Regions:
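Generic alpha-helical scaffold signal
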Residues: 4, 25, 34, 49, ...
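Glycine/small-residue-rich phosphate/adenosyl-binding loop
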Residues: 6-9
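Internal, well-ordered alpha/beta segment that forms a basic, Gly-enriched binding/recognition surface
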Residues: 38, 45-137
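Short polybasic linear motifs
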Residues: 302, 306
Length: 307
């Protein structure tokens, strides 16, 4: 019923999946309404009211955690990636009170959320330590996360929430994955970008991961953004180590991609983020590719009564 020059295009690309949800058929991994300058043709022509909820919210993400709401920006958005990499200092995370909605979380939920939050806060602080390289800070964050994981595996939730984790060992650079391992771990059976498999093949052919092209601050901000977004996943899988490993692997892959492609750092961040965020199985494949065993699946986490 839309009477507009875009109506014919809209009808042509609109699809309905088996569950009755509508979506746009993509072309070379791109939304058919995404202009070359990265703007939405629908929004630019018809206004924000024409967007679906997914497009209206993007690149914002929001997660309800116990008695708070966390928000952030997806680095799949070119503007979000550009702004992140233009920062001259590590990220700062801002909190503000929300209106009381009457929800009262249970004791176990509060305890576990407090524990995982404390671990993530410490990891974020370690990633931003002044006077250290980004690699050294990643190593320290990984050492701490592994120590915290031992506490979590032993159900020492109160100790974690109170920050009582064994002293972090002396800095030691993490053992780097080879380019071939990284390429296999980030491979996708249904890539959004048709060039993704070829770039990963080029990465796999590298003899070693090259030095990062990004600055230390850029590496820090990117690692912080990944840990901020995924650090609380441990509420489901009980794994506080994987978000740090994911951040480290992403930084190494970006260094490799910078050596084999003509993309800018911001473009590469967008590329990698889109390939991961738009595939619900991507993180599971990445975990398997990096030979990381999941601590607990979501159902086991809910059934765990030792909290």
């Amino acid at each position: 019923r839309l009477q507009h020059p875009l109506a014919a295009k809209l009808r042509r690309v609109l699809r309905v999946d088996s569950e009755g949800d509508t979506y746009f058929a993509q072309t070379d991994g791109r939304c058919p309404f995404l202009c070359v300058e990265g703007l939405c043709e629908l929004q630019r022509t018809l206004g924000e009211q024409s967007l679906c909820r997914t497009c209206r919210d993007f690149p914002r993400w929001e997660v309800l955690l116990c008695d708070r709401v966390e928000q952030g920006l997806s680095l799949a958005c070119p503007e979000a990636a550009r702004r992140l990499l233009e920062r001259s200092a590590p990220l700062r995370f801002v909190s503000a009170p929300l209106p009381d909605d009457g929800y009262v979380p249970g004791v176990r939920e509060r305890r576990l959320t407090a524990a995982v939050t404390a671990v993530r806060d410490r990891v974020l602080a370690l990633l931003a330590r002044p006077g250290h390289t980004a690699e050294e800070n990643l190593a320290a964050a990984l050492d701490f996360a592994r120590a915290a994981q031992r506490q979590l595996d032993r159900h020492r939730i109160a100790a974690l929430a109170a920050g009582k984790v064994p002293a972090v060992p002396a800095d030691a650079l993490p053992e780097p994955e080879t380019p071939a391992v990284l390429a296999a771990a980030f491979a996708s059976p249904e890539p959004l970008d048709a060039r993704w498999p070829e770039w990963l093949r080029r990465v796999a052919a590298l003899p070693a991961c090259p030095p990062p092209r990004m600055t230390a601050v850029q590496q820090t901000c990117l690692a912080q953004a990944i840990v901020w977004r995924h650090g609380m996943d441990a509420l489901d899988d009980r794994d506080v180590v994987f978000p740090v490993q994911y951040a480290a692997a992403t930084l190494r892959l970006l260094a490799c991609l910078a050596a084999v492609s003509d993309r800018t750092d911001a473009q590469l961040v967008v590329l990698v983020t889109r390939e991961v965020e738009n595939d619900p199985e991507a993180l599971s494949r990445l975990r398997a590719g990096l030979q990381i065993e999941p601590k607990m699946n979501a159902q086991e986490a809910r059934d765990d009564e030792k909290m």
